[in-house]
C-alpha cells in the first residue's frame, strides 16, 4: 500500500467514558523529544510501534515497512504515523495556536434532530492554522481547513461536550475550547408524541398517473406546523394546514417506491411513517431489482419471491443458491448417454438453467420446429419422464414445468452459448452463421439495432411465459471491446462491431429488465434476469466496468476454462486461488510487473472480487466445472502441472479464438477426450474434455461399460498407464497425471467442491453454479452381468473393481449439504457505514479505449452536480473499487486520486485476496467551483479490471453524504441554506492547481522538483522521479504525468 498523506473522513462512533476522558485529557500537545530516536534508514526493516526521526519530525511505524519515506508515506492508513516535530533539548520555539468555540453556547435550547452549527475562531502567533477539529464527547465529527471554521452536527438526546481544537502548520494543537450542551429528547415524558399515518388513493399505478397522498396528522398537546411528503428520498411537496393532502404525479417506475411523510410539530418533534407504491415501468425507466416494502411498525410485505430482508426466497434448506445447467442435447433413449429431467437431483437445487435457446434468422428466440413431435424442447416424450398433459406442450420444457412445481425449483432459459452467440443450428443440425446476438443488437454502422432488440426481447418474454419459466439467462460469448475474444466463426460479425458492442449489450439488458418487470407486475410473479459472465481479467478488461449488473438479479461467473488446450500452458481449469506459479501469467510477466501489484487473475477468488465491486456478495454465484480440460504429450512441470505442450501446428483448431495470442496447446484426444466437439470437417477437436464420472473411472483404472456408445473400444483406444490423482492445496484444484502417456487432466471432485462451498459461505456469496448436471458422478455397484445397480456412496465398489462411475449427484449433494445450514448471503454493496443523507450527484463512466489500447485502463468518470447549488473547489469525493485491481489507482486530471484505505496490501494474492474494497479519494481543484448543473471529469487510471465503482460519498461542510442514485430511500439533504461546502476537502494532489503556479517548460533550461506542474506544447504535466532539463514532457511516462491544465 502506498499512500501520500491522504485525508480520510472519520465517522462518528461511540466511545466508553474512560476512552473519551483520555482523549479529552490530551487537549494540547508538545513536541517530541527525539534525542533517543534513531534516524530513519531506507534499508532498515521497521515493524508496528517502531519510532524514528526524520527531517526534524518523529514518526511511528503502523506496520511492517521498508524503504518507505516517512514524509511521503504517513497517514492513518499508511506505513508511518506522524507523532510531532522533534526537540532534543526539552523546549520548542513553536507556539501553540489558539482556538475559541463560538457556537453552540451553553444556553442554547436543543432538541433531538436539530442541525447544530459548530463554529470556532482560531489564530496562530507564529504561523498559520492548518485546520480546526470539532469534537463531540471526544470524537472528531468534522474538520474545517479554512476560515470561517464551521461545520454541522445533528443533535442526539443527552448531555454532550462540544470542543474545538486548532492545529498550526507544524501540527501543534491548541488547548481545547469546549462547552457542555443539553439536548432534549423530543419524545420525553410530559410531551405526548404526535401521530401520523399515510393513505394512498391507489397502491399500483402507471408512470404519469396521479396518486393522492393523505397524511392523517395530529398532536394532542401541541400543534402541527407542517407535513413534508417524500418519494424515494426526494421532497415532492409540503402542506402546512389541514387537510394534509398532496396530489403526486408519478415520474419514475419501480416496485416499491418509498413514500414518506415527515410531521413537524410546534415542539419540533419529527416522525416519519412510510408507505410503498408500485409504479409500472415506463418506456425509459430503469427498475430497481429486489427492493423491500417497509410498512409502518416495521412490517414488510412479501411479493415476487423476495423476503423481508431483500433476499431471494428459496426454501428453508436453501439459504444459498445451487444452480445447475441442464443441456438439451442429451435427449436420446440410451441410458448410457441420456440425461433427462427425471435424473435431476431436484431436492438439492434452487435453480435450473436450460441450455440452450438460440436466436433464429428472424431475430426471435429459437428452439427449432415447435410442431415436430421429436423436438427435444417442446415435442418429445420419454418413458419414465412425467409431463403434465394439461400444459399443452411436451419435451424438456413440459417436463421441467411439471417437476419444478413439485420441488419449488426455479427454471430459466439460457440464450446463447459458445456455438450460438453468433448463429444457430437449423432443423438438420447444421450451424447457420447469421450473426445472432451481434446483428440483433448492433447495426453494421455500429449503431444500436433498437428494433432488433425489441423484437428479440418480446419473443424471449413470450417464450418464458408460454413455457412456464421463471426468467432469462443471457449467455453471450462474448460482447467485448477487446479483439479475438469470441468464437472465431463469428469474426465476420463481431470484429467490425467490436467498438460498439458494449453499448448495444447495455441496451439489450436494459430493455430485457424493463420488459420482465412489466410482465412481473402483470402476472404477480418476479421474473428473473441473469447472465453467465467470464472470469479472467483479459476478457473482463474488454467489458468496461460491467455496468449491466444494475439490471440483474444475480450473475453466474464462469470461473472455469481458465486454462485449456487453446494455449500450451498446462494448468488448472478452475483454480480457487492463485499460487504465484501460473506459467501463463509468468510468461506475460504479470507477477513481475509493478503496476499489477503481483496479483494473479486466473482464479475464482479474483473473479468474485471483481464483481464484488458493483454487487452485494449475495448477487454473485461462482462457477464450478463438472468436466475436465487436458493436454497430451506434456513436458516439464510438477506431474505435468505448469508444464507445456505445444500443438503440432500453431493452430490445431479455431475453437477458442486468439486470446492473448499464446501458442495453441496439444489437447488430449480419444479415451482422454470423450465429450469432444468436432470441427467443420467432422474431426475430433483435442481438448481433454470429459464428464467427471469418466475421469473418476480413469483415475481408478476402470474401463467404463458406456465407452462403446461413445465410439471407443479397447483395441483402438486402450487404457494405458495409471491416472494418478494429484491435489494443489493452495489453488484448491485436483488433477490426473498419466506419466506413461504424458496426459494431464484438470478435474473437480468432492474434496475441492467442499472447500469451494466453504469459501462461498465464508464470503457471504450467493451460491454456486455448475456446468453441467450430466457431468456429476456417483459410484454404482455392478451386478454379475456388468450392469449398474445401486449407488455406493462410500465408493468402495469402484475402488475395489466391483463398480463403475456414471452420471450422479455426488458433488451437487456435497454443495447442498454444506449450504443447507449456512447463514444468509450478503445483501449490501457497502462494507462500512453509509451516510444518513444523500445528495443528487450523477455518475457516468465511459471513454474506454478499444483492444490493446485499453491499457492502462483509463476511463473518464463524469460527476454531474444535480444538487441545485454550487459545490466549492477543494470538495473531497470518495468511492470504493474492488481489490481485483491493485491499490495504485490514480488520475490524470489533477484531482489527486489515490487509495486512502487499501483492502489488499500484500505483494501477491497467493491463497486469496485479503479484503473486499479499496477506498479512493480525490478533490476538486481548490480554485474551481463545480456549478449546479455542471460536470467534473475525472480521468482515472487503474491497471486490472474492476466493476463498479460503488459507495460514492462527498464531504460538504464536514458532513459526508451518499449519492442519491445509490441510496434512493435515504432522505435528500437540503444544501440550499448555504451550509454546503468544501471544508472537508482533502489533498488535491497531482501537483499545483493554481493557474499562476504552472511553470512554462523550456528544454535544456527548466529545472523542476517532483510535484511541479509545467506546461509544454499546449499540455500540462506533473513532474515525478526528478526529470532532467532535457526530459521534455510529451506524454505520461516515468518522468511525467499528463494532467488537465488549470
Curated annotation (Swiss-Prot):
Give the organism the record lists: Vibrio furnissii
Influence of pH: Optimum pH is 6.5-7.0.
Q: A GO CC term? A: extracellular region
**Which CDD domains does the UniProt record give?**
ChiA1_BD (cd12214), ChiC_BD (cd12215), GH18_chitinase (cd06548)
Temperature characteristics of this protein: Optimum temperature is 35-37 degrees Celsius.
Say which family it is in. Answer: Belongs to the glycosyl hydrolase 18 family.
How is the protein's activity regulated, according to its record?
Answer: Inhibited by (GlcNAc)4, (GlcNAc)5, (GlcNAc)6, and PNP-(GlcNAc)3.
**What InterPro entries is this protein classified in?**
CBM5/12 (IPR003610), CBM_sf_5/12 (IPR036573), Chi_C (IPR009470), Chitinase_II/V-like_cat (IPR011583), Chitinase_insertion_sf (IPR029070), Glyco_hydro18_cat (IPR001223), Glycoside_hydrolase_SF (IPR017853), Glycosyl_Hydrlase_18 (IPR050314)
**Major localization class:** periplasm
Question: What GO terms in the biological process aspect are recorded for it?
Answer: chitin catabolic process; polysaccharide catabolic process
Positions of the UniProt region annotated as Disordered: 973-996
Location within or outside the cell: Periplasm
Instruction: Specify residue ranges for compositional bias: Gly residues.
Output: 978-993
> PROSITE patterns given for it?
GH18_2
What reaction gets catalysed by this protein? Hydrolysis of chitodextrins, releasing N,N'-diacetylchitobiose and small amounts of N,N',N''-triacetylchitotriose
Which pathway does this chain act in? Answer: Glycan degradation; chitin degradation
Q: What is this protein called?
A: Chitodextrinase
Amino acid at each position: 500500500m502506498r499512500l501520500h498523506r491522504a485525508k480520510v473522513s472519520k465517522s462518528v462512533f461511540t466511545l466508553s467514558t474512560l476512552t473519551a476522558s483520555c482523549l479529552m485529557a490530551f487537549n494540547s500537545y508538545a513536541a517530541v523529544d527525539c534525542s533517543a530516536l534513531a534516524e530513519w534508514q531506507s534499508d532498515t526493516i521497521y515493524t508496528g510501534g517502531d519510532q524514528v526521526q526524520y527531517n526534524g519530525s518523529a514518526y511511528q511505524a503502523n506496520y511492517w515497512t521498508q524503504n518507505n519515506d516517512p514524509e511521503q508515506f504517513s497517514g492513518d492508513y499508511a506505513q508511518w504515523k506522524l507523532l510531532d516535530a522533534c526537540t532534543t533539548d526539552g523546549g520548542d520555539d513553536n507556539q501553540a495556536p489558539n482556538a475559541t468555540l463560538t457556537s453552540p453556547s451553553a444556553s442554547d435550547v436543543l432538541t433531538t434532530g436539530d442541525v447544530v452549527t459548530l463554529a470556532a475562531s482560531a489564530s496562530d502567533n507564529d504561523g498559520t492554522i492548518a485546520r480546526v477539529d470539532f469534537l463531540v464527547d471526544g470524537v472528531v465529527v468534522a474538520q474545517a481547513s479554512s476560515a470561517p471554521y464551521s461545520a454541522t452536527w445533528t443533535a442526539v438526546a443527552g448531555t454532550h461536550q462540544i470542543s474545538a481544537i486548532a492545529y498550526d502548520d507544524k501540527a501543534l494543537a491548541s488547548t481545547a475550547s469546549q462547552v457542555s450542551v443539553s439536548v432534549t429528547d423530543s419524545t420525553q415524558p410530559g410531551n405526548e408524541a404526535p401521530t401520523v399515518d399515510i393513505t394512498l388513493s391507489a397502491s399500483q399505478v402507471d408512470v404519469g398517473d396521479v396518486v393522492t397522498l393523505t397524511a392523517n396528522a395530529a398532536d394532542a398537546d401541541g400543534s402541527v406546523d407542517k407535513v413534508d411528503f417524500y418519494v424515494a428520498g426526494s421532497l415532492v411537496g409540503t402542506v402546512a394546514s389541514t387537510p394534509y393532502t398532496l396530489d403526486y404525479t408519478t415520474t419514475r417506475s419501480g416496485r416499491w417506491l418509498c413514500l414518506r411523510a415527515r410531521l413537524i410539530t410546534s415542539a419540533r418533534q419529527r416522525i416519519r411513517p412510510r408507505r410503498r407504491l408500485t409504479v409500472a415501468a415506463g418506456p425509459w425507466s430503469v427498475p430497481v431489482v429486489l427492493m423491500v416494502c417497509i410498512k409502518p411498525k416495521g412490517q414488510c410485505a412479501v411479493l415476487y419471491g423476495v423476503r423481508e430482508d431483500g433476499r431471494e426466497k428459496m426454501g428453508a434448506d436453501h439459504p444459498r443458491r445451487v444452480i445447475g445447467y441442464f443441456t438439451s442435447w442429451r435427449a436420446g433413449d440410451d441410458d448410457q448417454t441420456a440425461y433427462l429431467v427425471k435424473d435431476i437431483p431436484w431436492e438439492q437445487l434452487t435453480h435450473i438453467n436450460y441450455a440452450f435457446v438460440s436466436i433464429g434468422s428472424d431475430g426471435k428466440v429459437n428452439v427449432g420446429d415447435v410442431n415436430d413431435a421429436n423436438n427435444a424442447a417442446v415435442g418429445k416424450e420419454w418413458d419414465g419422464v412425467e409431463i403434465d398433459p394439461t400444459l399443452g406442450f411436451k419435451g424438456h420444457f413440459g417436463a421441467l414445468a411439471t417437476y419444478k412445481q413439485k420441488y419449488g425449483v426455479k427454471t430459466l432459459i439460457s440464450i446463447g452459448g459458445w456455438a450460438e452467440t453468433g448463429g444457430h443450428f437449423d432443423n438438420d443440425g447444421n450451424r447457420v452463421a447469421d450473426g445472432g446476438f451481434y446483428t440483433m443488437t448492433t447495426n453494421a454502422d455500429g449503431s444500436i439495432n433498437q428494433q432488433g432488440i425489441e423484437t428479440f426481447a418480446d419473443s424471449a418474454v413470450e417464450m418464458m411465459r408460454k413455457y412456464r419459466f421463471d426468467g432469462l439467462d443471457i449467455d453471450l460469448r462474448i460482447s467485448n471491446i477487446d479483439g479475438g475474444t469470441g468464437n472465431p466463426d463469428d469474426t465476420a460479425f463481431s470484429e467490425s462491431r467490436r467498438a460498439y458492442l458494449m453499448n448495444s449489450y447495455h441496451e439489450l439488458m436494459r430493455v430485457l429488465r424493463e420488459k420482465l418487470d412489466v410482465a412481473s407486475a402483470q402476472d404477480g410473479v418476479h421474473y428473473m434476469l441473469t447472465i453467465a459472465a467470464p472470469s479472467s481479467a483479459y476478457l473482463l478488461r474488454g467489458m468496461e466496468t460491467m455496468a449491466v449488473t444494475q439490471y440483474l438479479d444475480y450473475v453466474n461467473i464462469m470461473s472455469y476454462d481458465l486454462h485449456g488446450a487453446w494455449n500450451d500452458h498446462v494448468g488448472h481449469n478452475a483454480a480457487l486461488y492463485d499460487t504465484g506459479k501460473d506459467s501463463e501469467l509468468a510468461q506475460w510477466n504479470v507477477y513481475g510487473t509493478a503496476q499489477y501489484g503481483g496479483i494473479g487473475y486466473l482464479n475464482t477468488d479474483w473473479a468474485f472480487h471483481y464483481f464484488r465491486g458493483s454487487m452485494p456478495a449475495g448477487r454473485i454465484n461462482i462457477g464450478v466445472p463438472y468436466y475436465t480440460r487436458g493436454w497430451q504429450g506434456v513436458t516439464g512441470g510438477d506431474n505435468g502441472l505448469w508444464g507445456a505442450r505445444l500443438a503440432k501446428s500453431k493452430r490445431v483448431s479455431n475453437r477458442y479464438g486468439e486470446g492473448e495470442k499464446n501458442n495453441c496447446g496439444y489437447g488430449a484426444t480419444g479415451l482422454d477426450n470423450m465429450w469432444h466437439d468436432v470441427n467443420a470437417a467432422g474431426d475430433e477437436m483435442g481438448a481433454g474434455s470429459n464428464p467427471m464420472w469418466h475421469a473418476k473411472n480413469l483415475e481408478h483404472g476402470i474401463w467404463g461399460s458406456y465407452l462403446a456408445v461413445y465410439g471407443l473400444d479397447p483395441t483402438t483406444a486402450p487404457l494405458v498407464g495409471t491416472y494418478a490423482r494429484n491435489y494443489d492445496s493452495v489453488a484448491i484444484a485436483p488433477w490426473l497425471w498419466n506419466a506413461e502417456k504424458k496426459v494431464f487432466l484438470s478435474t473437480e471432485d468432492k474434496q475441492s467442491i467442499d472447500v469451494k462451498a466453504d469459501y462461498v459461505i465464508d464470503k457471504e456469496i450467493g451460491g454456486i453454479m455448475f456446468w453441467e448436471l450430466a457431468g456429476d458422478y456417483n459410484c454404482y455397484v455392478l451386478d454379475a452381468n456388468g450392469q449398474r445397480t445401486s449407488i455406493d456412496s462410500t465408493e468402495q465398489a469402484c475402488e475395489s473393481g466391483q463398480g463403475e462411475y456414471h452420471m450422479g449427484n455426488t458433488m451437487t449433494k456435497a454443495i447442498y449439504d454444506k449450504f443447507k445450514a449456512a447463514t444468509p448471503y450478503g445483501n449490501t454493496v457497502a462494507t462500512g457505514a453509509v451516510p444518513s443523507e444523500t445528495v443528487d450527484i450523477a455518475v457516468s463512466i465511459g471513454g474506454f479505449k478499444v483492444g490493446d489500447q485499453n491499457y492502462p485502463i483509463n476511463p473518464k468518470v463524469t460527476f454531474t452536480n444535480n444538487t441545485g447549488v454550487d459545490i466549492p473547489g477543494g470538495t473531497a469525493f470518495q468511492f470504493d473499487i474492488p481489490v481485483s485491481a491493485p491499490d495504485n489507482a490514480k488520475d490524470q486530471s489533477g484531482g489527486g486520486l489515490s487509495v486512502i484505505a487499501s483492502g489488499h496490501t500484500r505483494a501477491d494474492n497467493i491463497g486469496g485476496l485479503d479484503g473486499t474494497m479499496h477506498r479512493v479519494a480525490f478533490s476538486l481543484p481548490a480554485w474551481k467551483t463545480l456549478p449546479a448543473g455542471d460536470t467534473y471529469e475525472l480521468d482515472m487510471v487503474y491497471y486490472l479490471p474492476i466493476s463498479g465503482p460503488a459507495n460514492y460519498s462527498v464531504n460538504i461542510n464536514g458532513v459526508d453524504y451518499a449519492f442519491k442514485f445509490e441510496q434512493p430511500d435515504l432522505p435528500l439533504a437540503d444544501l440550499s441554506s448555504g451550509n454546503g461546502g468544501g471544508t472537508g476537502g482533502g489533498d488535491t494532489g497531482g501537483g499545483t492547481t493554481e493557474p499562476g503556479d504552472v511553470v512554462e517548460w523550456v528544454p535544456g533550461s527548466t529545472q523542476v522538483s517532483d510535484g511541479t506542474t509545467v506546461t509544454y506544447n499546449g499540455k500540462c504535466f506533473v513532474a515525478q522521479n526528478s526529470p532532467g532539463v532535457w526530459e521534455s514532457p510529451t506524454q505520461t511516462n516515468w518522468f511525467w504525468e499528463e494532467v488537465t491544465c488549470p
